[in-house]
A protein has these predicted regions:
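Short, flexible loop/hinge motifs at secondary-structure junctions
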Residues: 1-185, 257-258, 319, 398, ...
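Catalytic center-proximal scaffold of phosphoryl-transfer enzymes
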Residues: 2-3, 121-123, 132, 159-161, ...
Length: 536
């Protein structure tokens, strides 16, 4: 049986070819639109349910519902082994040694409790002689907690008279002792109390309203308004001079990281209570040896505030892609590869691989760059610059060439990533010429994270002065943490000693209280020490 054939003239053939081409083009557009809609749905799911961490182990695993449960439930492991000196836990196929008891309690005092025999038990049951202690053996360790104790200290000024002068002249020479300076006149506030309030709010994220309830349970009627006054007055009077000195030290650094976040201030002139203000943060990197984390409150997000703060600074400024930083003159702008990687991550569909997703290619390029930076991290600035030009520069050349081959759908997350990369190319490449610069803005982002977490608890500031005071205290405690200090101990020391310097202390006096000085480290990092039973 022969094949049936249909005769088609040339015009009909061209029309069919054109129709097939149009259908293929329409199909491609619809597939692109479908991919875009799936991308929007995936990002909505991520925003609502997903893991916010950017650690690479959470990415490219195909899941979207990460971190759905509360921390206690998500982290609970009924088979978890209590840490000991020799314990090594093996989750799945990886081995990671857990911290030992000694490491977990390294900064705690130790009380030794000897379980001894009573007088009756000291009598030997065989011969009637007396047992003598010949040794001791550690059987167990337990972590104990002593609730805080409050008491009132009354300071009395003592007067002394010279009886010899009185005998000779009839008038006694009288001297009177000087009591320690007060934080505030006619107030119960002490350095320890105010430091405790500040630490609980700005380090532990405990709002003053909750602190008020804690004081009530301890039998003390201390209102949140009183605590607020303590924080504001002590920050403005005693901590602000050191805060300003920290700014001067920061501007002398060669690299500054900058970022900002929202803060709501209820009673701000000319603005509605629901309007947004800004908390700016500036930080140097750890290569300086003197870590500084500086917060500054401003009524809005205008780049003029960054320009004013950084006036006179001529080093490298590491930021995200916010255009407001373009107003800062005289600096070398450096971009953030963490932001770049985040754009690729957000553009990756579920289950993305390099074979199925162009965004996964961009994400992989970024991961390779970060892997190189990890290898370079211990190098000096000069050697790191050379290493980057040898190993990182070829990687970036390939990255930028690959980027030019992309033609993403308008409005897609992939298009956002490509646009960000092209707009930031100059800034993203700047680190190649500056070995002292890190490739991400993580120093500023990590510094501002405690503020963002605390904001979830206390929600807003009442007044601009309160917001400014919060900026001062956050600067002090975050800089203390960056320098390895205990924030409470450092605050207590500052509030004890700074009043002796008066309200306008000299710069050289303030330098003695910077958190990286040897004396401050000695007093504000708690050493491990042994305490005998007789001492407690």
């Amino acid at each position: 049986m022969g094949k049936n054939t249909v005769a088609i003239d040339k015009n009909e053939l061209e029309e069919l070819k054109k129709a097939a081409h149009d259908l293929a083009e329409e199909n491609a557009q619809l597939r692109q639109k479908l991919d875009h809609m799936n991308e929007l749905l995936l990002n909505a799911q991520r925003a609502r349910f997903g893991q916010s961490s950017e650690r690479t182990k959470h990415v490219m695993q195909g899941g979207t519902q990460l971190g759905l449960f509360n921390e206690a439930e998500a982290e609970q492991d009924h088979k978890a082994v209590e840490p000991t000196e020799n314990t090594i836990v093996i989750p799945e196929h990886t081995r990671k040694a857990k911290r030992t008891v000694d490491e977990l309690t390294a900064n705690l005092p130790v009380k030794e409790v000897l379980i001894t025999l009573s007088d009756d038990e000291l009598i030997c049951g065989k011969c009637g002689g007396k047992y003598e202690m010949i040794g001791k053996k550690l059987v167990s360790r337990r972590l104990e907690v002593i609730p805080r104790q409050c008491y009132v200290v009354e300071y009395y000024s003592c007067s002394y008279a010279c009886k010899s002068c009185e005998t000779k002249t009839g008038y006694a020479n009288i001297v009177t002792t000087v009591t320690p300076p007060m934080l505030m006149k006619h107030s119960l506030a002490s350095a320890s109390t105010v430091a405790n309030v500040m630490t609980q709010k700005y380090v532990d994220g405990l709002p003053l309203a909750r602190q008020e309830k804690i004081w009530e349970r301890e039998g003390i009627r201390l209102s949140r308004a009183t605590m607020s006054n303590w924080v504001i007055q002590c920050a403005q009077t005693w901590l602000k001079p050191l805060y300003r000195r920290m700014k001067k030290a920061l501007l002398e650094c060669s690299v500054i990281h900058a970022d900002e976040t929202v803060v709501q201030v209820l009673k701000e002139d000319g603005k509605a209570a629901v309007s947004e203000s800004r908390m700016w943060v500036y930080a140097n990197n750890d290569r300086s040896g003197k870590p500084i984390r500086y917060f500054e409150y401003q009524p809005d997000r205008s780049g003029k505030h960054a320009a004013a703060f950084l006036k006179g600074f001529s080093g490298c400024l590491v930021t995200d892609g916010y255009a407001g930083y373009n107003l800062v003159d005289g600096v070398i702008r450096c971009g953030c590869w963490s932001h770049m990687r985040r754009y690729w991550r957000e553009a990756m569909p579920k289950g993305a691989t390099k074979e199925t997703s162009k965004a996964a290619w961009g994400y992989d390029y970024c991961n390779k760059l970060f892997a190189l930076e990890k290898k370079f991290s211990k190098m000096s600035d000069v050697i790191r610059k050379t290493a980057r030009q040898v190993e990182a520069e070829p990687l970036l050349e390939a990255y930028w060439w690959w980027l030019e081959t992309l033609d993403p759908a308008p409005g897609s997350k992939l298009a956002d990533a490509v646009t960000y990369a092209k707009n930031q190319k100059k800034f993203l490449n700047a680190f190649l010429e500056h070995g002292e610069v890190d490739i991400s803005n993580n120093f500023a982002e990590n510094a501002i994270r405690p503020f963002v977490q605390g904001r979830k608890a206390w929600l807003f500031c009442d007044t601009p002065k309160g917001a400014d005071s919060s900026a001062i205290v956050y600067s002090i405690v975050e800089t203390a943490k960056a320098n390895g200090l205990d924030p409470y101990t450092y605050l207590k020391l500052l509030l004890t000693e700074l009043p002796y310097l008066g309200k306008n202390p000299a710069s050289d006096k303030l330098d003695l209280f910077m958190p990286w000085t040897a004396a401050i480290h000695k007093n504000c990092i708690l050493p491990t020490k042994k305490i005998s039973p007789e001492d407690l």
